[in-house]
Amino acid sequence: MQTFKKLILILLLLALFVFSNGQYTFNVLNKAPGSKCENGTMAELNTCSKDCLTSFLILKSIDKKSLTFTTFNNNQCNGDYNTQTTFDCKPTPQNISQTQYFISCEEQTSKPTSSPIHSNSTIKSTSTTTTSTPLPHKDTPHHSASSSSIVVRLTPIFFIAFASLIFLFGF
């Protein structure tokens, strides 16, 4: 009976990790005057890939307190997607510009209306702090294109998992 109880708890713990990888909503980290946010993590979005992208997502600040994903369509594969960055996607080798935003995340209950980020997006659990405005762009090698990453804070998930492990092996 004790083994069965531990097996059930392990399955519940596994389900916790599986279902915690859901949709997220993002809040701006903005230490500028008037900001109400203090903590955040970093998201990097690559705007170009080996083949020209005709649509992509970018984080956009609406009320200086929150960020939302906005989908931009660009059939000509060149143009201005925000006030500080222009891109020119070409099928030939080139350097890729990156835009960095610093955000924190909380799981949201409803799915966003915009399309998801590229299928090869990765989620990491590192955090840092800075302003929410885009930083100066760095050129990255062409081979690192076609990947976007969103860095989210997973501390609450790991705390629940740790507590579950203590409960699991403590009884």
Curated annotation (Swiss-Prot):
<dbReference type="GO" id="GO:0098552">
    <property type="term" value="C:side of membrane"/>
</dbReference>
<keyword id="KW-0325">Glycoprotein</keyword>
<dbReference type="GO" id="GO:0005886">
    <property type="term" value="C:plasma membrane"/>
</dbReference>
<feature type="propeptide" description="Removed in mature form">
    <location>
        <begin position="145"/>
        <end position="171"/>
    </location>
</feature>
<protein>
    <recommendedName>
        <fullName>Ponticulin-like protein E</fullName>
    </recommendedName>
</protein>
<feature type="signal peptide">
    <location>
        <begin position="1"/>
        <end position="22"/>
    </location>
</feature>
<feature type="glycosylation site" description="N-linked (GlcNAc...) asparagine">
    <location>
        <position position="120"/>
    </location>
</feature>
<keyword id="KW-0336">GPI-anchor</keyword>
<dbReference type="GO" id="GO:0016020">
    <property type="term" value="C:membrane"/>
</dbReference>
<feature type="region of interest" description="Disordered">
    <location>
        <begin position="109"/>
        <end position="145"/>
    </location>
</feature>
<comment type="similarity">
    <text>Belongs to the ponticulin family.</text>
</comment>
<keyword id="KW-1003">Cell membrane</keyword>
<feature type="lipid moiety-binding region" description="GPI-like-anchor amidated serine">
    <location>
        <position position="144"/>
    </location>
</feature>
<feature type="compositionally biased region" description="Polar residues">
    <location>
        <begin position="109"/>
        <end position="118"/>
    </location>
</feature>
<feature type="compositionally biased region" description="Low complexity">
    <location>
        <begin position="119"/>
        <end position="133"/>
    </location>
</feature>
<keyword id="KW-0449">Lipoprotein</keyword>
<feature type="glycosylation site" description="N-linked (GlcNAc...) asparagine">
    <location>
        <position position="39"/>
    </location>
</feature>
<feature type="glycosylation site" description="N-linked (GlcNAc...) asparagine">
    <location>
        <position position="95"/>
    </location>
</feature>
<keyword id="KW-0472">Membrane</keyword>
<dbReference type="GO" id="GO:0051015">
    <property type="term" value="F:actin filament binding"/>
</dbReference>
<keyword id="KW-0732">Signal</keyword>
